[in-house]
Amino acid sequence: QISSHYDTSIFNYFAEDSNEVLKISNNQKRTLRYGENPHQKGMFFGDFDAIFTQLHGKELSYNNLLDVDAATNLMQEFLDDGPTFAIMKHNNACGLSTRDSIKEAYECALAGDPVSAFGGVLISNTEIDKETAELINTLFCEVLIAPSYDADGLEILKQKKNRILLESKPLHANKQSVRSVLNGFLVQDKDTAIETASSLQNATTKEPSAHEVKDLLFANKISKHTKSNTIVLAKGLQSV
């Protein structure tokens, strides 16, 4: 089993640019409490600890991992932006905002849809400080993800024993996405396209202002990671 996994790793390394053969092998398995529903078995194959350090809370569930994946992929779009906070529910962002401080970003993200935020997965692109932790602590959330937490903030967030606190590490994402369908797999390159102001084409007689262009690009990043047919409304770098 070990040598087979090793051989597959070597093959995939040298065949990186080839689409002729798909080989998947992973010898790191995490058994989950159950799958999407309690009557389904669930497993995760991958090195979770290479991406996150779990600082607190219960074991992650199958559905938690889906939301954590969606949240992480979304926040990759905002790593170079100012303090940004997103709230995920069922793999979609129900609130997201970029502000001058992470506290403001959280408050504005929550204001986008405070009802759906209940029981969601929260993610920040910067450190969670004490002030922000105090606000988050009043909300029931399944998971909170951040690159770091200050000591006081972490102690506050640990007051809820089941709340999952993850410290994120730099992500080296897969270049392709794979999905099981019928008796095979669908494989495609991940969408890494980045829209800029120069790539926008005005479809009306009214020219957008510089602030409106920023909001358009902001909303477009969210739309890219929203499931199904999508309309994202944004104003002032905040989803509404």
Task: Give a label for each model feature.
Residues 229-240:
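Conserved structured catalytic cores and adjacent interaction surfaces
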Residues 195-210:
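Active-site/ligand-binding-proximal alpha/beta "capping" segment
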Residues 1-149, 153-191, 212-230:
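Active-site loops and adjacent core secondary-structure elements that bind or stabilize anionic groups
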